[in-house]
């Protein structure tokens, strides 16, 4: 009795599944032949297929490794004016980032002092000036703090950082002050 009920249920399942199987898509059998697409083949003796940017190479320049140090973002440009600094700070404030000021007394660049591999003492970490400026809404406040930092340490390198406190990452960093006589 139980076996007849089971077989009836199994037959009912198979009968119900049949219409669904009829509408199934055929399985993937591979890519079709590409002979339908017209292509042109270059001969192996054709040297024009070798990649070349010879026309552009002459206008590209390399950053000189001696004499000019790369400090931060925008450091390849002439020093930013007060108005340009204010615009950069306004940009980071518009993005909702927290402005921070940092300074370095000896080196404004990444350098290796104690080891050949990168580490804590290679110039990437600068000293923070006071605290991050949470709640700051005006670029003038940031520039006043920059002036205070320069007054306290006239021989320092100073940079402004935009910190995103939601993602907890540094989003922008640029050199705001180089001491007199710096390269």
Swiss-Prot record:
Residues 1-58 form a transit peptide. It is found in: Plastid, Chloroplast. It comes from the Eukaryota. Keywords: Calvin cycle, Carbon dioxide fixation, Chloroplast, Photorespiration, Photosynthesis, Plastid, Transit peptide. GO terms for biological process: photorespiration; reductive pentose-phosphate cycle. InterPro entries: RuBisCO_ssu, RuBisCO_ssu_dom, RuBisCO_ssu_N, RuBisCO_ssu_sf. GO terms for molecular function: ribulose-bisphosphate carboxylase activity. GO terms for cellular component: chloroplast. CDD domains: RuBisCO_small (cd03527). Its main location: plastid. RuBisCO catalyzes two reactions: the carboxylation of D-ribulose 1,5-bisphosphate, the primary event in carbon dioxide fixation, as well as the oxidative fragmentation of the pentose substrate. Both reactions occur simultaneously and in competition at the same active site. Although the small subunit is not catalytic it is essential for maximal activity. Heterohexadecamer of 8 large and 8 small subunits. PANTHER family: RIBULOSE BISPHOSPHATE CARBOXYLASE SMALL CHAIN 1, CHLOROPLASTIC (PTHR31262), RIBULOSE BISPHOSPHATE CARBOXYLASE SMALL SUBUNIT, CHLOROPLASTIC 2 (PTHR31262:SF19). Belongs to the RuBisCO small chain family. The basic functional RuBisCO is composed of a large chain homodimer in a 'head-to-tail' conformation. In form I RuBisCO this homodimer is arranged in a barrel-like tetramer with the small subunits forming a tetrameric 'cap' on each end of the 'barrel'. This is Ribulose bisphosphate carboxylase small subunit, chloroplastic.
């Amino acid at each position: 009795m139980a076996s007849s009920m089971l077989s009836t249920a199994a037959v009912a399942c198979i009968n119900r599944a049949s219409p669904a199987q009829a509408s199934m898509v055929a399985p993937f059998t591979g890519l079709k032949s590409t002979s339908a697409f017209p292509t042109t083949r270059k001969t192996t003796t054709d040297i024009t297929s070798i990649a070349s940017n010879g026309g552009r190479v002459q206008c590209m320049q390399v950053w000189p490794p001696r004499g000019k140090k790369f400090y931060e973002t925008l450091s390849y440009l002439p020093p930013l004016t007060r108005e340009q600094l204010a615009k950069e700070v306004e940009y980071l404030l518009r993005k909702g980032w927290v402005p921070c000021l940092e300074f370095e007394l000896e080196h404004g660049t990444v350098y290796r002092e104690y080891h050949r591999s990168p580490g804590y003492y290679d110039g990437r970490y600068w000293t923070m000036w006071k605290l991050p400026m949470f709640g700051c809404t005006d670029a003038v406040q940031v520039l006043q703090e920059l002036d205070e930092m320069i007054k306290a340490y006239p021989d320092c390198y100073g940079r402004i950082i935009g910190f995103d406190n939601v993602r907890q990452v540094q989003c922008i960093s640029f050199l705001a002050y180089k001491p007199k006589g710096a390269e």
